UniProtKB/Swiss-Prot annotation:
This is tRNA(Ile)-lysidine synthase. Disulfide bonds: none annotated. InterPro entries: Rossmann-like_a/b/a_fold, TilS/TtcA_N, tRNA_Ile_lys_synt, tRNA_Ile_lys_synt_N. NCBIfam families: lysidine_TilS_N. The N-terminal region contains the highly conserved SGGXDS motif, predicted to be a P-loop motif involved in ATP binding. GO terms for molecular function: ATP binding; tRNA(Ile)-lysidine synthase activity. The keyword Ligase applies. It comes from the Bacteria. Belongs to the tRNA(Ile)-lysidine synthase family. The gene is tilS.
Length: 415
């Protein structure tokens, strides 16, 4: 009789985490695993190869070769072979060039990587991509956010499930709107976005997928048809189906556990040299900051940071939801290049909501992500006695007080 080893707690925890994150029935749709060859992504691959078929789904993989290592092409091919051994199909290898993006090395790699993910989603019409971020990654992300001083949003870290609109600004290296996606299923319409759970489904999001219309092109996302600088806001009516979903089922699984999973399955994983390069902020936090915190404060620091992220997500998502509703009510589009916001309403609005409305107006109408400084400057326009009357924003956008309104418009003219 063939003896099968008893699964370990790490394997059981990871299977349970993935089962709890995915819909109960995938309706034979494809889910891609983002594979790098590292322990986390290999652990996600083997767990997904067990979980997803049991949810009536198919498993494939996308391997992104950043070309930053001399042997990166060979590593990508080895990862493909390993994925084939676990019957993943299809397996896509996407070769990207992060150096072409004018940003820092970490941001450039991320932008190029997400562009490759979108290409893979479009090419395969996959339901989702699974990313193998762990609890350790979440803790590091929270610390990175605190370093940047970006307020409560820095504490919420990464979401277990996020939708294409959240990250579509990375598509084609150009900013796009944060748009609420509309889902149609179970004979009723259900508005779900990255800040809400599905109101007509008892399971955590994402909602159950529908069979895809193969005659339809799902990418680029409709929100990405925006032109930089135009005052065109895309709302629920612009999207009539579900698009790409990014799922992080391992946010409660530690890096130690993913190593144990690889050990259980006899998988040799690749250690990316960049994960040891202290030029990168995340690496310094991982190897220099976190060990000190664990030694000086206690071994539960990363768990506390992860728990903080979950609590912060609940608070910030609720505030974002209220802000979106208020923006829907008060914003008036004056032209293709101008909107206005009533000063009286903003003055009566609590500061946390007011600042969010200002930021959302700039982002959703002009695809401009405002800094805290610019947001505060626009807020000063609400004060009639203040000496400031207009604010110059990035990408030739201007905010100006005229009468009882704040006007935001682009200096590029009608687009």
């Amino acid at each position: 009789m063939l003896h099968r080893p008893r699964i370990t707690p790490a394997v059981a925890n990871a299977r349970r985490a993935m089962l709890n994150t995915l819909p109960a029935d995938l309706h034979n749709q494809l889910v891609l695993i983002a594979l790098s060859g590292g322990r986390d992504s290999l652990a996600a691959m083997v767990i997904a190869s067990w979980v997803i078929p049991r949810l009536n789904g198919r498993v494939g993989a996308v391997v992104v070769d950043h070309g930053l290592q001399e042997n990166s092409a060979r590593i990508a091919d080895e990862v493909r072979i390993r994925a084939e051994q676990f019957a993943l199909n299809p397996i896509l290898i996407k070769r990207v060039s992060p150096s072409r993006v004018s940003a820092g090395p970490e941001a450039s790699a991320r932008i190029a990587r997400y562009a490759a993910f979108y290409d893979a989603l479009e090419e395969t019409k996959a339901y989702a991509i699974i990313l193998a971020h762990t609890l350790d990654d979440q803790a590091e992300t929270v610390l990175l956010g605190l370093m940047r001083g970006s307020g409560p949003s820095s504490l919420r870290g990464m979401k277990a499930v996020s939708y294409t609109p959240e990250d579509c600004r990375y598509m084609n290296n150009k900013a796009c709107n944060s748009v609420t996606a509309v889902y149609a299923h179970n004979t009723q319409r259900c508005s779900c976005d990255s800040t809400q759970r599905c109101s007509c489904d008892s399971r955590p999001y994402p909602p159950p997928p529908e069979p895809r219309n193969e005659n339809r092109s799902y990418f680029p996302h409709p929100s990405c048809k925006c032109v930089e600088g135009s005052a065109t806001r895309f709302t629920n009516a612009d999207i009539d189906s579900r698009f790409g979903v990014f799922i992080r089922p391992f946010l409660d699984i530690t890096r130690h556990e993913t190593g144990k999973i690889c050990e259980f399955y006899g998988l040799d994983y690749w250690n990316d040299p960049h994960n040891e390069d202290v030029r990168f902020s995340r690496v310094r936090i991982r190897h220099n900051v976190m060990p000190v915190l664990e030694n000086e404060i206690g071994p539960g620091v990363k768990y506390a940071l992860s728990r903080t992220a979950k609590l912060a997500q609940l608070d910030t998502e609720y505030l974002d939801h209220l802000s979106n509703e208020l923006l829907d009510e008060i914003a008036s589009k004056e032209s293709d290049w101008s909107i206005r916001l009533p000063i009286n309403t903003l003055q009566k609005t609590p500061v946390p909501i007011r600042l969010r409305v200002i930021r959302l107006a700039a982002l959703q109408y002009f695809t401009v992500s405002l800094s805290f400084k610019h947001t505060r400057q626009i807020e000063r326009l609400l004060c009639s006695s203040c000496d400031i009357k207009h604010v110059n924003l990035p990408r030739l956008i201007t905010a100006q007080r005229v009468g009882n309104y704040i006007y935001m418009h682009t200096l590029r003219g009608k687009l």
